[in-house]
Amino acid sequence: MKKIIIYLVIAVIVLVGLAGLREILGRKAAEQSDSGNTYATALGEEDPLVQRFMAGNSDEEIILAFSDDVNADGTPDLIAIVRGDEMNHTIAMISENRDYFFTEPVPAPRENQKVKFINIDKDDDLEVMITGEKNGQVGYAVFKMMKGRFKDLYGENMKDCC
């Protein structure tokens, strides 16, 4: 009888410990997603920004599109990865005085593309990190809007994954 009680007490302690661990891990995951450690969510074709992009670039095939306020003017901007014959490209549609302009294309990964909006330099605007791969070669680049152009701040292996 004593052994049964001891086993029951141990089982209760283990269950309480597992429940506590689950709660701690859940909070940690929520903190990570709140701290910018997650990739941006892709927009669908029905999104108004995607439709506006397509109206100005009807010959482009969007692979993925993402939105955030890149230039810190209070209006959402669009980052689109578009399919190219030889190479994919990233084109930004940036808001300016209630209108939008399109940046020149920059190379983009061929497969498994992801975008993260981050504020590396702690100024008002956001930098855009693009990652992806081609045939198992992983690469990434960090871009910043400067004077109406997407400036490549830093990257690694983008030539191998584009």
What are these regions (language model features)?
Residues 6-20:
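Hydrophobic membrane-insertion alpha-helices, especially the h-region
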